[in-house]
């Protein structure tokens, strides 16, 4: 610790000149000394908290800050490790490899007598996994609960710890630490996991069952973000300097604050005007006369305005169901809604994606006529119901489950009474969205995590890049490269979760009918899946988790996250634990022409039979559908054209939503979509 050195002559001169000045100076000196003492405290990053999991079998870095030159001692498992803070106050010790175990207590202390000792208890040694990406990592246990009700209700495991990185951005370069978070190494219980990543929860559970050692799950994701936000400036600068310049524009903090304030004020005023013009609450009353309202069918509703629109549906409840607790499933809606039953609000959702699951308290449903009133608030695009979702009242002890669906249900009708509340111009944007700018998330929430020892990384992202898939493979290569550089581990394992199947024509502001895409299309989702496939294939320390059968046609956030975690776990079984017995998704090895037929060789046997979603192209580059059959590890594709047709390329499952794709391994894993030039010997 550094002390202020002030001569006695200085004090005597100061005292004789002015007593009041002397008092002020002593006050200043005391304050300065307090600051000096405060700065002398040894500190640790936010990752280091009680309950944490440290990585087994690898060197364990522990780091933090102290006064420059101060000696810092770290004690773990009754062993001491000492280092000295550098000229910038940074210190680090590397603990030797440890076996799985615990709980242990870790103590960190400076050399000075007044230095506060930091005590971190309940520390486990096991496996630590980092999950990053966008909203499909964000999807919580709360969201998927109806898919796995019994499992989530009953499963607890203090050996699995959950850590959620708090969202933050930086346009001014890298940060030293992340922000404090409320989910800080919490043990797995239903309550602790409720707002935690479902993919992370199930990965921890799966890997614990595999290894029987403690599991630490760090989730670091942000919905809607592109991959560029997660890559370092140094990695982008050479090949994509304009991306770095785009972020530099937002380094003007005053501009950003002014823009955010203006947008927020415009949004606030829009809401105020909306509520002033549509202030009536009469429409929620059971006895309101809606006979003169227009009747619409939710499956072909044509209103295209923005503002508010009211919908009402009467439903008859028999004596058996009257006064019982229930759950209303109102599918998903575009965009916002406030929903009432018999004049009482039962739920609201302020954006389009979450499923509407509204619990009805006991006593609210009455025998006879009841009315559901929905106030749509639509700030842009066209208000609509998302098809293929459940719209019903659910009763009984299993009413919270959707896998299977409850036994006692009353389906809602497709028809509603409709009345326009108020029509408004589209609402202005309320967010500058710094999280979508290149480098901002790498700077703020990725860089500070290193060098915390990890066993592997899950990258589950891509939806926000489907509009421009061409550079994605290179972006992904740069992301894996700069993260490995940051951890100084060029063999850091990555599992890339490929995009699921999805048809986005309904989850947009201008919905279009969902019909099967029978003809070949130039799919942005397929192109991005191909970028993920080729990037993973080119990297010896990466694997691809194929999930093109786990999506939902009308939902960009499919619920089957346990199955996603299982496939990620299989990849880690091979990549990290070197389990040679594990079979992953079938992978295309080669393609060639034999006797006028295109023959594909796969890395393993696949289920035999007729196959779908194959296309071939001739010299003109135009793809056409083709029949295919599987036998062992070979797929034979028959040309649908004339005998002189010369196939040049073949591709598979080349659609946003390739619902008929059916190439599977003998264990049931689906093959990735691909496009390949045919080898012509």
Regions found by a protein language model. Give the residues of each.
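Ser/Thr-rich low-complexity repeats and stalk/linker segments
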Residues: 41, 49-124, 382
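Surface beta-strand/loop "capping" patches
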Residues: 46, 55-58, 303-307, 327, ...
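Aromatic-lined ligand-binding clefts that engage carbohydrates, nucleic acids, or primary amines
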Residues: 63, 293, 315-343, 372-374
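Beta-strand-rich ligand-recognition modules
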Residues: 78-101, 332, 339-392
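C-terminal beta-sandwich/jelly-roll accessory domains of carbohydrate-active enzymes
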Residues: 80, 603-681
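Short, aromatic- and glycine-rich surface loops/edge beta-strands on solvent-exposed regions
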Residues: 102-111, 373-374, 647-654
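Short acidic/polar inter-strand loop motif in beta-rich domains
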Residues: 111-118, 377-384, 654-663
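An acidic-aromatic loop/edge-strand motif
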Residues: 118-187, 218-300, 369-443, 447-452
